[in-house]
Amino acid sequence: SDARRERVSGGETKIDLSANVLFDKDSDVIKPAGGKVIDRAAHELVEHKVSGTVSVIGYTDNLGSAAHGLDLSRRRAGAVAKVLGPQLPKGVRLVTDGKGEADPVASNDTEAGRRLNRRVTLTVKGVS
């Protein structure tokens, strides 16, 4: 699915958004289909009465230079936050960052794995 929700210990919820749906290759411009994915994630956060801080963290695969991946992941996180922010309740704070190829969720040895690693993750604390 284009948005995967997973629970993490300590009352954290993480929603992974696939960068392949959000962006064209090597781009930080959100595609129309990507906008819909962000809208759905925002709706889900509002439904669960999000408050406090939402972290928006970009990740890439290990292709290309690490410096380029880090820069791209930061720009992508910022682009997602721009669309997400206005849809969230007043008082919710967005923090953006990019981790580049760090913290992969799958092996970068296969295209399928790299596809999973290209993502923007929303992390929320204290969501019901």
Language-model regions: role of each:
Residues Y59-S128:
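Periplasmic OmpA-like peptidoglycan-binding domain that tethers envelope proteins to the cell wall
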Residues V21-K31, L63-L70:
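Second-shell loop/turn segments in exported
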Residues A3-R4, S9-G11, D109-T110:
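Short beta-strand/turn micro-motifs at beta-sheet edges
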Residues R5, T13, L17, R75-A77:
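Generic low-polarity alpha-helical segments
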Residues T13-I15, L22, G64, A106-S107:
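Short, functionally important structural connectors and interaction interfaces within domains
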